[in-house]
Structures are given as C-alpha cells and as structure tokens.
Amino acid sequence: MSLFRGSGVALVTPFTEEKDVNYEELGRLIEFQIENGTDAIIICGTTGEPVTMSEEERLSVISYTVEKTAGRVPVIAGSGGNCTENVVSFSKKAQLFGADGLLVVTPYYNKATQNGLYEHYKVVAMAVDIPIVLYNVPSRTGVNFLPDTAARMGNDI
C-alpha cells in the first residue's frame, strides 16, 4: 500500500433541484481541482453528504469520479459508518469501483471504547487492499480516536 502525499480536496456532492446527483457539476468540480493542482480527490466524505445518499448513489459517485479523474490523481472514497460489517461491505465495493483509498470516519453515536475503535479499523483495514485514512472528527462523532490507539494500529497493521 502506498501513502498519499500532498493536498487532497474533499468535494461537495452537487445535487439538482430534484435531489439527484448533478454529475455535470461534479465533473466541473473535479476538473477545476485537478487543473489547479490538487494531489487527490476525496469523494463522499462529510462535505459530500454521503448520509443523504443511497448506497447505489454513493457507488455511482465513486465510479464517476474514478472515471473522470482517469488516473490523474488518486480518488479517496468515504466509506465510514457505525456498523463494521456494513463499512467492510461498502469498502470492498468502493475498492472494486476503483477507489485508490478509503476515508473511514470514526464510528459515531455509539461512543465505542478505544479498543472497540481499534478493532473496527483493524477489521476494515484487513478486508481491503487499498490504504485507509482514519477520519477522526470528534466534534461530529462524539468520540476521539486517541494518539496512543493510532500508534498501536500503526505498529500492528
């Protein structure tokens, strides 16, 4: 697994008035970022509103982004959630759809212990063959993935 370098931009997901993904605008956003030197595109992260989309829509956005970037920059796809099994399932699909890496938010609401967070991320990391970015945003999730836990994970995986 290679590490990502430089600056990655977390894109919004543009929608039409009818609440469908606006692929024309998404394409413009992707091209703008690449033309202006971003080193990676992050899709379906918090600002991409994945919780408002179906799994089919999320996978379609990932697939479109992979196709549009055409290998010019890596695509990092948001695949996080509360249920480890669901995160693993979606992460595998995102990898099949061509994502170069995964953005996996710390499970929210349930307030897992540090060991629970470690196990969650370990199971996800072991299930895919692409790098994962641990997305620790305690102000949104209500739980903080502590540095000691991250160091343990870095040593073990």
Regions found by a protein language model. Give the residues of each.
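Active-site/ligand-binding-proximal alpha/beta "capping" segment
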Residues: 149-157
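Active-site beta->alpha loop and helix N-cap motifs at the rims of alpha/beta catalytic domains
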Residues: 2-9, 14-144, 150
